[in-house]
Structures are given as C-alpha cells and as structure tokens.
C-alpha cells in the first residue's frame, strides 16, 4: 500500500460468481475515470488472473474471528464493514464488482465526507407506497455498491458491540444500514442521477448520459423470482454496457 496516495479503493471477490475479469475491468474503469492517484485493493480468496497493479488482501483474514463465526445468511457482505476499522489516512471507497463506471468520478472521490456516503435507491424510493412497509422490514432503499468515507470508525464499533443481536435481526448489510442507521441520519447519500440501475430504472437497460456508473446486481431479483428481465455485466453482449466493460481490458 502506497501511503503517499490518499485515495484508496477496495473491492471484494470471493467464491466463483465473478471471475478475475470483473476485478481487472473495475480497476481499468477507475484508472480511466479518476485523475487522482489511488491505490486499488482486492480482498479475495483467489487471486488467480488478477492484474499485477491490483493490491491483494486475503479474504479469509479480513475482520475479527468472531465475525466469521456467523454464516452468510447473517448480514450478508458484512465483511465490507471491516474496512471502517482500517488504519489508513485519507479517503476510502469500496466498489462492488458488478458496478460499471462509465463517467468521470474525480470530483466525487475528491469531496470531503463528514458521513459515510452510500447510494440511495432513487429508482425505487419514489414509487407509490415506497415507504409503506418500513416497519415490516421488507423494503430496502440503501445500496452499498459504491461507498466513500474518511472516518467512520463508529460504524464498525457499533456493529461489533451489538453483533449478536444485529446478526439475529438482519439478513443483509443493506437492510442493516437502512433500518438501523438511515433513520438516525448517520449516513449520507450520493445525489440522484449519479448512479443508475440497469435492471430496475425505468425504462430499464437504458444508457443515461448524466450517470457516472450503472449497477447490475441481480441476485435478489432472481432469488425472489420478481419476473424482471435482469442481466449481469457478463450477460450484456449485444447491449450498450458490453463494449464499455470489455474496453477496460486495455
């Protein structure tokens, strides 16, 4: 890690859902669209095929041992929160692998962040009755696919202190953030229009000039059998994302 660089990107890759091309192309997209010197670290259980410019951390060593004692059905992707406990100066960001960056993000990542800054699902939250089921716990309008912060140690500490009851209560990281911290105004959000959703925005599968990045997360769509035509990045051949995504091999 080059500590002279005050901008640090992180991404996670474990299991077999996404290959190394996802890591390599995400790095390539940031290299193209970020004019600030940065470190890029992949936290992974398999570094095979990852380009040499990418720094590596062992996924099986990230975070406290007692966090790993819980199954992945408890606050799924909670590993991301361990990044708030890292002793690194400057601005930190995590970016999910299924996030296609296609616009300049230099201004975004150069901001001062008083609060950890997440994506708000604008494509869902304005729908009629979007907040109707808040008390039931079935909705979720916080998205953790592109997150920036400078000092958010409190979020790791709160989670660690209350780990047992939080693991009992929440199945996913985004729901934990939405129901536990969004309502207490401890989170900030990117402005509407910066992030788009390929499968959920209306009309779907459309390129939007104002967006800096587009999300392709499909797991919840398919698990819940929502009847939406949904594509992962590697399934978009013949559609507009494909040429952009594959260009980052260069």
Model-derived segments and spans:
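A glycosyltransferase accessory/donor-loop signature
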Residues: 1-25, 36, 42, 50-59, ...
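Short, charged, surface-exposed secondary-structure boundary motifs
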Residues: 19-22, 64-72, 125-132, 232
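Active-site-proximal specificity loops/subdomain of glycosyltransferases
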Residues: 43-88
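Short, surface-exposed amphipathic charged segments that create phosphate/polyanion-binding patches used
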Residues: 55, 70-76, 130-137, 204-210
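GT-A fold catalytic core of metal-dependent nucleotide-sugar glycosyltransferases
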Residues: 56, 76-127
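A conserved catalytic-core signature of glycosyltransferases
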Residues: 79, 96, 142-144, 172
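Short beta-strand-to-loop element that shapes/binds the nucleotide-sugar donor at the catalytic cleft/hinge
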Residues: 117-143
